[in-house]
């Protein structure tokens, strides 16, 4: 049975196609403290996810990362020794592509969060650009997060880890995830030989290609980083109109079909 690495800490969700478990960055190295000013730690009720600051008031993450009493931490590198410019916010509003966040469909695992008040840009806090065009196959992209660094054990690092992976042919993911539609609004990315991957706790974090957020960590295999088992990312480019409409104040905007 295919396991979905719905990358939130032991967060088990019922999907419309299959049930799977979550994961984090495996096979990477500690990120440079200055290379992730847009990276957000999203947490609630003992669960953690990643997120991406796209402007001073808005964050992108995965729909399955939603929960009560959510907090978002900005300007964070070490969780135990925070930067002086760290900031914490809570959601003011949340927007989803689905009527229920508990039933995640391929390509609709996306949540747009409006913060209770804007963050202040600083040395370790700055937004990441939205995509100007979709990434092509074989593009080398970056993944990052505070997720577990072991494919089989829950070993959560104090600092975020980063790794480079590549955009793969959609058919590679369809071979492992039979419910994935040919034209779903997702990206397939990973390393075919295995060894580098997102893992538990990395859900909602960014897939960064050419300095832009192209994907949101959604689904993967269990255990993480297995050969020929890439992960699935919600494709941000296909949701640009929805994202921009919501931010502009059109809260009734609908997601692409």
From Swiss-Prot:
Tell me a GO biological process for this protein.
proteolysis
Where does this polypeptide localize?
Answer: Secreted
Keyword Ribosomal protein (UniProt):
no
Hey, what's the signal peptide range on this chain? 1-18
* Pfam families per the UniProt record, alphabetical: Trypsin
Active site per the UniProt annotation? 64, 109, 203
* Residues that carry a glycan: 120-121, 164
Q: Which SMART domains match?
A: Tryp_SPc
How is this protein organized at the quaternary level? Answer: Monomer.
Question: Which family would the database say this protein is a member of?
Answer: Belongs to the peptidase S1 family. Snake venom subfamily.
Name this protein carries in UniProt: Snake venom serine protease KN3
Which species is listed as the source? Trimeresurus stejnegeri (Chinese green tree viper)
């Amino acid at each position: 049975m295919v396991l979905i690495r719905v990358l939130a800490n032991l967060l088990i969700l019922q999907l419309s196609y299959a049930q799977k478990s979550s994961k984090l960055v495996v096979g990477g190295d500690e990120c440079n403290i200055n290379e992730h000013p847009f990276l957000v730690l999203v947490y609630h009720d003992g669960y953690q996810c990643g997120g991406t600051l796209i402007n001073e008031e808005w964050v992108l993450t995965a729909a399955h990362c939603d929960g009560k009493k959510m907090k978002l931490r900005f300007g964070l590198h070490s969780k135990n020794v925070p930067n002086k410019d760290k900031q914490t916010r809570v959601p003011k509003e949340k927007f989803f592509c689905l009527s229920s966040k508990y039933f995640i469909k391929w390509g609709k695992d996306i949540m747009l969060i409006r913060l209770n008040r804007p963050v202040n840009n600083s040395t370790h806090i700055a937004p990441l650009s939205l995509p100007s065009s979709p990434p092509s196959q074989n593009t080398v992209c970056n993944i990052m997060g505070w997720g577990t660094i072991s494919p089989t054990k829950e070993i959560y690092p104090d600092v975020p880890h980063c790794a480079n992976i590549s955009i793969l042919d959609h058919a590679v993911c369809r071979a492992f995830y039979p419910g994935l539609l040919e034209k779903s609004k997702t990206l397939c990315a990973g390393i075919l030989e295995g060894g580098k991957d997102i893992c538990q706790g990395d859900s909602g974090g960014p897939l960064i290609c050419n300095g832009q957020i192209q994907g949101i960590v959604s689904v993967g295999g269990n255990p993480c980083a297995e050969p020929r088992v890439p992960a699935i990312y919600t494709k941000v480019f296909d949701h640009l109109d929805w994202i921009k409409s919501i931010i502009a104040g059109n809260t009734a905007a609908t997601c692409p079909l």
